[in-house]
């Protein structure tokens, strides 16, 4: 605030004393003035071309400073505010200015969109004909379970027991399946965006890196599922900084009533039980239950943190390993697996408590991506693009 006031005073002073300070023309020649303007903007034109030539969101290799500043260290997850502070405001501006969100499809027109709209409107009318309940009549809890993916699906992994028996049992009785994640070992916010808003990342330009910073600010209308709920009944819970991935800005624009986090928001988490390198899933669930009101239909967007890397746990009698893995890789694997077992137990307790509440409640539970502990050889493919590396 002080800097804004100071800047205004400087501008006013320059305007007020302009005739005394600037007597006559500093550069009398029009040609020289035009040349100076061109020289000022010439470097920016080169920078603009450099940013425009990015591939898959990465600056072309060999560009001094920029490749080290952006490609080597991934800072997008820290949000626009931190990016501007660490990489400069102009860096963020140029990146946003040159990021093309989506390529215009062939035969794109209002008429073609109207045709699609009417087709699916009629289909929706048919599907909803005999449905008596509206989604806003119940409470919906989206649980993004950090890095949750069954290790037994990785070929060659040996486990002394099933570490997620409750989750696997629930999958047999309720709607379930495998989800394709866009990321491997990361990309949480992108999966969060897609589940909330329903816009698949594969329809967007490959230069898009983080949906919350590259796409979200450009949306004139945000078709979030939370729109079906009153603003006062929208909650986000994440036991990390609210500023990560610009979540504070995102959930504010989505008109969420409260964002329960560690910092960056007035609504601080009340329950914090340490686990591994972060906080337990039990802590996350307890904070959800703290705000759950049976008298209201609420929407919760919940992101856990327990299973985020690095992974620390006491495996006890649990034995998990894969032949060909290094000692450190197997160490991470068994610790991660033990944390999954804790997730399974805490999720079971959470669902049991929800079942005792006199209110229709639906829980959408999913893992955002595989943990980044597996080497490429684990997928029997040449790279991490193998489908098995992206199924949770």
Question: Each predicted region: which residue ranges?
Answer:
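N-terminal secretory/membrane-targeting segments
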Residues: 1-137, 158-178, 215-219, 223, ...
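Solvent-exposed soluble domains appended to multi-pass membrane proteins
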Residues: 125-135, 144-145, 150-391
């Amino acid at each position: 605030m002080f800097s804004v006031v100071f800047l205004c005073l400087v501008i006013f002073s320059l305007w007020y004393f302009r005739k005394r300070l600037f007597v006559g023309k500093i550069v009398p020649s029009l040609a020289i003035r035009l040349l100076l303007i061109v020289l000022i903007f010439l470097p920016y034109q080169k920078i603009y071309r450099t940013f425009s030539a990015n591939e898959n969101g990465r600056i072309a290799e060999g560009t001094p400073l920029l490749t080290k500043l952006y490609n080597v260290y991934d800072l997008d997850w820290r949000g626009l505010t931190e990016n501007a502070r660490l990489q400069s405001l102009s860096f963020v501006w140029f990146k946003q200015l040159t990021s093309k969100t989506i390529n215009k499809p062939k035969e794109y027109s209002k008429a073609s969109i109207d045709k699609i709209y009417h087709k699916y409107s009629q289909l929706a009318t048919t599907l909803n004909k005999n449905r008596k309940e509206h989604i806003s009549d119940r409470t919906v809890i989206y649980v993004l379970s950090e890095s949750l993916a069954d290790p037994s699906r990785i070929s060659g992994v040996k486990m002394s027991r099933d570490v997620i028996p409750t989750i696997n049992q629930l999958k047999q009785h309720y709607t379930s399946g495998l989800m394709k994640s866009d990321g491997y070992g990361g990309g949480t916010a992108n999966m969060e965006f897609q589940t909330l808003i329903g816009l698949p990342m594969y329809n967007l330009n490959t230069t898009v890196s983080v949906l919350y910073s590259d796409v979200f600010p450009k949306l004139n209308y945000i078709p979030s599922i939370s729109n079906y709920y009153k603003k006062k009944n929208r909650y986000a819970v994440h036991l990390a900084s609210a500023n990560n991935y610009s979540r504070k800005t995102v959930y504010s624009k989505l008109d969420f009533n409260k964002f329960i986090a560690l910092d960056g928001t007035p609504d601080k988490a009340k329950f914090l039980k340490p686990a591994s390198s972060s906080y337990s899933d039990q802590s996350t669930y307890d904070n959800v239950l703290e705000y759950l009101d049976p008298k209201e239909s609420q929407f919760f967007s919940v992101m856990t943190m327990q299973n985020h890397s690095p992974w620390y746990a006491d495996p006890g009698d649990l034995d998990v390993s894969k032949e060909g893995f290094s000692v450190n890789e197997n160490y991470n694997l068994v610790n991660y697996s033990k944390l999954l077992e804790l997730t399974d137990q805490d999720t079971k307790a959470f669902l049991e408590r929800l079942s005792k509440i006199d209110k229709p409640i639906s829980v959408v539970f999913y893992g955002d991506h595989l943990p980044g502990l597996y080497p490429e050889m684990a997928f029997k493919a040449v790279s991490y693009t193998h489908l098995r590396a992206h199924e949770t």
